[in-house]
Amino acid sequence: MSDRTRTTRYANGSLRTCQNCARAKIRCIRSVPTGSCDRCERLRKTCQFQPGRRANAGPSLSESKDRRIDALEAKLDRLLAQSTSATVSEASIDDKSPTTTPTTPRPPPDVIDSGLLTLEAASLLLQDYQRTLMPYCPFVMVPSPATAATLRRDKPFLFLAILTAALYDNMPLQRTLELEVKRTIGRCMIFDGPVSFDMLQGLLVHLAWCQYHSRPRRFSQYLHLAISIITDLQLDRAPEDRFWRTRVDFNGELDREISWGREERRAVVGFFWFSSSISQILQKRSSFSFIPYLETSCELLASTAEYDSDQHLLQLIQLQRLSERIIVASGQHTSEPHDADALEQCYRDRRSELDLYLAQLPFPLTDSHLLMMQYHTVELYLCQVTLFDHKPSAQRPRHDSPFPIEALRMGLTAARTLLDFYISLPLRREVAFNNAGWVQLGFVVTLACKLAVAAADPHIHPHMADLTRALDLSTMLSRCILRIQALVTSQMDARGDRDVFYHYEKRLKRAQWWFESRSLSRSQQQRNEPLPVAGAGEASSPRNARIAEIPAEEEFQVGYAAVSGDGFDFQWPGLFPDPTFDDMFGDWMAQGSSGFDD
């Protein structure tokens, strides 16, 4: 109620309520300072007031109650006034612009707003990403002029993913930012947030270094979310071919110009590369099949390269395509026995393709760490498929062919090259390795142990002695463990989990124990058994007679003679596969499965 009303009620010394209003138990209001109250005048009654009490008397109960009522009325007046002004303001806006849509709610505060990082710290992390991490993920390039402030404004989710990846030296804070990444993905992909190209690039960066994530890791789940964005935006086809026909929309020309240029091409190539290379080693079906558009995109990027890495993308994709063709020879997808002749032919075809690929490479293999690691991993994968993955045929395998020895030597050579490369890196360089690189290293360690134990077989050791001596796997594993130990910290995240290198160290030590225990067992067995000596008795056997008929020029080409088959079955059925050892390294290379977690 207004001040004017309160003034008239306090104007004289009488009580504030006339006798008529008091009997009716209603409020008595006088519009003028003197005369009848409004109700008595309206009803034409005599308005009489009882005289008030003495001035020095204390306030009566009714007066205190009236004052409280007045205070509540004043508060109600203010609230009504605010509500009225807001309604008038909204009405005026609607009158001026009737088509205006409701304003978009402000996004939640990011890691800078919440105080987890300062903008200066974010700038340093962005520079570290550009200098250290970006060479190992050439699919999301951040140009040098870009600043933390501009990236935060234009691509907030990519900005968050980059900060998370670059915090490898502060694991607790990195895991905290990872939670922010999960919340953002849930808000944008599950609830009502925008699904954008920024989200796609951020997912690629988040997947690239997912070895730093808390366990269980969600590689497959994030990958499928990213592929859904690629499918919805039709980024797996040329821009001119997108939305060329719409069957349910009358205005099909609106989205024809959707394109993010070179950035989108790099991103799509990157998702294929990560999906194919990792799933192949982990024996999973790739979620992203090859399409010719990938090679077309790589050729376009290489023709007018903005970055040096643009010239390597085509070779990365071509090598991965070659690797996918090796899967055909693997017996892990079928229970049917493989024919030894067909397997040998497959091995030689793939070996020739690898040699031709290397010969036609337009730059040295060592120019790209990604390509060099991938090439020798493909060699090892061919060795794995040839020697261990297939089911032997019912008939006894051929022992007059040198190709199993070729495959074993190729595998030992590739393992030594990759492990030498790793231990010769500058200290702490491996913190920048992407997830695929660590999967490849885990595969190398696993297969190197198996190959070295197999090469110690007394029937084939003479053909492998030079390579096993050069590899010196026990010493090599010790040096790898020392490198990993330099990266282990005492930090723990909010759930009490240690950093990823702590777990890598444990697995390397278990691999070393596995290898050395079997090497020791083999040595003890060899001391108790006489080594086979080639003599007249061997030459007279029918099998060795066939071996002796191998042309000398073929022996010269492969660099060693065929091995005696009396004690040698190149499939090593009693040794491989070894489930215990595979479980040992399962968590290193497994993605998205909590069953292997320690």
From Swiss-Prot:
InterPro entries: prtT, Zn2-C6_fun-type_DNA-bd_sf, Zn2Cys6_DnaBD. Its main location: nucleus. The keyword RNA-binding does not apply. Residues 18-47 bind DNA. Signal peptide: none annotated. GO terms for molecular function: DNA-binding transcription factor activity, RNA polymerase II-specific; transcription cis-regulatory region binding; zinc ion binding. Keywords: DNA-binding, Metal-binding, Nucleus, Transcription, Transcription regulation, Zinc. GO terms for cellular component: nucleus. It is found in: Nucleus. One of its GO terms (biological process) is positive regulation of metabolic process. This is Transcription factor himD. It comes from Aspergillus japonicus. The gene is himD.
